[in-house]
């Protein structure tokens, strides 16, 4: 949409100038009304009065108990020593005790209360630091003990594995030893069991009698029976955990 000079023909030539002068005349009127609303006091006075509304309620104090704006009073060494000594007797401050300390030390009761409050906070902080150091030492000692126990556990596990690996070899050696003992026992039993009387008769050159021959035959048959029994016992000693049927030899000597 475009504007041209033909549109201005509807308005008088002094229209814009009149509006400009009217705006300039209206501004002083507004300022006068604003000053009338505030009254005779200046705007700075009103701002200061607004800021002082909260200050009239509660009085503010600094950390040492003095009012804001007043010069801070620092405690001397005697006052500090007296307060420390009294704090050691009891960290709880009652109203009567607070007033007595304030009169004795020449301080305000609020200063005494704030000092006790700060001193309790410092004592709690120191106690927490001590507890932390103690717990830290306990943790470190337990950690070292845990490492030692883990090392011992690993060694024991290695010993158990070594013993498990040795068990099959030891069982084989035991089987061999049992077999050897059984064979040695059978050899000892199957030795010469001929009676000494017969040996002495042959050594002297006397011919054996009929009774002697019968005894010798009986002894030889008994010897064969012992050998057969020993052979059977050797067969049983050589077998480990095997079940089966073993046929007995025909006992022809009894027929």
From Swiss-Prot:
Coiled-coil zones: none
DNA-binding region (UniProt annotation): 68-127
Annotated spans, Leucine-zipper: 128-163
Alphabetical list of Pfam families matching this protein: HALZ, Homeodomain
Induction of the gene: By gibberellic acid (GA3).
Any one GO biological process: lateral root development
Cellular component GO terms, alphabetical: nucleus
Annotated keywords: DNA-binding, Homeobox, Nucleus, Transcription, Transcription regulation
Subcellular location: Nucleus
Domain of life: Eukaryota
PROSITE patterns attached to this UniProt entry: HOMEOBOX_1 (PS00027), HOMEOBOX_2 (PS50071)
Tissues expressing this chain: Expressed in young leaves, in the adaxial domain of leaf primordia and the rib meristem. Expressed in the styles of flowers and siliques.
InterPro entries for this protein: HD, HDZip_class_I_plant, Homeobox_CS, Homeodomain-like_sf, HTH_motif, Leu_zip_homeo
Family, per entry: Belongs to the HD-ZIP homeobox family. Class I subfamily.
Name of this protein: Homeobox-leucine zipper protein ATHB-23
């Amino acid at each position: 949409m475009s504007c041209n000079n033909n549109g201005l023909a509807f308005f008088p030539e002094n229209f814009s100038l009149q509006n400009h002068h009217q705006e300039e005349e209206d501004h002083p009127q507004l300022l006068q009304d604003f000053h009338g609303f505030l009254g005779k006091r200046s705007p700075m006075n009103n701002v200061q009065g607004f800021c002082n509304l909260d200050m009239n309620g509660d009085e503010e104090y600094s950390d040492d108990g003095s009012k804001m704006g007043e010069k801070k009073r620092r405690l001397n060494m005697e006052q500090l020593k007296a307060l420390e000594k009294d704090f050691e007797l009891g960290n709880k401050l009652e109203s009567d005790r607070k007033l007595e300390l304030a009169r004795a030390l020449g301080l305000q009761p609020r200063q005494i209360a704030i000092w006790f409050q700060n001193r309790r906070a410092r004592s709690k902080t120191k106690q927490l630091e001590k507890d932390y150091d103690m717990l830290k030492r306990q943790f470190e000692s337990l950690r070292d003990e845990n490492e030692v126990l883990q090392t011992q556990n690993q060694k024991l596990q290695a010993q158990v594995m070594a013993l498990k690996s040795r068990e099959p070899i030891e069982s084989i050696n035991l089987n061999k030893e049992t077999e050897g003992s059984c064979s040695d026992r059978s050899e000892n039993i199957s030795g010469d069991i001929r009676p000494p009387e017969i040996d002495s008769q042959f050594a002297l050159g006397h011919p054996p009698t009929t009774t002697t021959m019968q005894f010798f035959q009986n002894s030889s048959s008994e010897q064969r029976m012992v050998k057969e029994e020993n052979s059977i016992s050797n067969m049983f000693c050589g077998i480990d955990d095997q079940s089966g049927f073993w046929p007995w030899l025909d006992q022809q000597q009894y027929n």
